[in-house]
Regions:
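Surface-exposed, flexible loop/turn segments at secondary-structure boundaries
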Residues: 5-6, 37, 50, 78, ...
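Short acidic/Ser/Thr-enriched loop-to-helix initiation segments
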Residues: 11-96
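Amphipathic coiled-coil/heptad-repeat helices and related helical stalk/stem segments
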Residues: 14, 55, 109-110, 140
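Short amphipathic alpha-helical patches
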Residues: 44-48, 79, 83-86, 113-117, ...
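Glycine/small-residue-rich hydrophobic helix-like segments
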Residues: 66-136
Length: 159
C-alpha cells in the first residue's frame, strides 16, 4: 500500500519508502488502495510526456485493463499542442481496442484528476511519476504525491 507500515491512521500520510521505490523502479509500480473494490473503468492522466508514452505502449501490449472503460484526461495548461497530443493518444488506445472518453481540464491537475475519479467512480488511475527533480519538488510540490494522497483508488505509476 501507499501508507507504509508505521502510518497508523494519519489521513493523507504516505509511507516513507514509497517515493524511493517509485523513483528507483524501471517497471510500472502498482500502489494498492486500502480496500478492494471492483474496477470497471480506469483513468489515464495524460500529460504527453515520455512516461505516458510508456503507459500507452503498456496498455496496447497488455490485456490487463482491456474491456474496461478508459477516461483519458489531460489536465493543466490546455493549448493546441496539448489537445492534439491527447487526441493522438486516444486514437492509439482505440486502435488497441479500448473504449475511450477524452476530457480536457484547464487548471490544477491534482484537483482535476481527483474530481474525475470521484465523480465517475473510476477504479484505477494510471499516471506518470516524479517527472521533476527533488529540488523542484521541494519548492513547487509534487503532482505525483498529491495524486497518491487525494485519490483513494489504486494507482499504476510509470517512470
Amino acid at each position: 500500500g501507499k501508507r507504509g507500515h508505521g502510518a497508523g491512521h494519519a489521513p493523507g500520510r504516505l509511507g516513507s519508502n514509497l517515493e524511493r521505490v517509485i523513483r528507483a523502479s524501471i517497471r510500472p509500480v502498482f500502489i494498492a488502495a486500502r480496500e478492494f473494490s471492483q474496477v470497471e473503468s480506469f483513468l489515464l492522466a495524460y500529460d504527453g510526456g515520455q512516461s505516458m508514452d510508456r503507459a500507452l505502449a503498456f496498455l496496447a501490449a497488455q490485456p490487463l485493463l482491456r474491456g474496461l472503460h478508459c477516461h483519458l484526461l489531460r489536465a493543466g495548461k490546455i493549448d493546441g499542442k496539448a489537445e492534439r497530443l491527447t487526441l493522438e493518444a486516444a486514437a492509439k488506445l482505440q486502435d488497441a481496442g479500448y473504449e475511450v472518453e477524452v476530457a480536457l481540464a484547464a487548471g490544477d491537475p491534482e484537483k482535476a484528476i481527483a474530481d474525475r475519479v470521484a465523480r465517475h467512480r473510476i477504479g484505477v488511475v494510471l499516471t506518470g511519476a516524479y517527472g521533476h527533480s527533488r529540488i523542484r519538488q521541494l519548492i513547487v510540490g509534487s503532482t505525483t504525491t498529491e495524486i497518491l494522497r487525494t485519490c483513494h483508488v489504486p494507482v499504476l505509476m510509470f517512470r
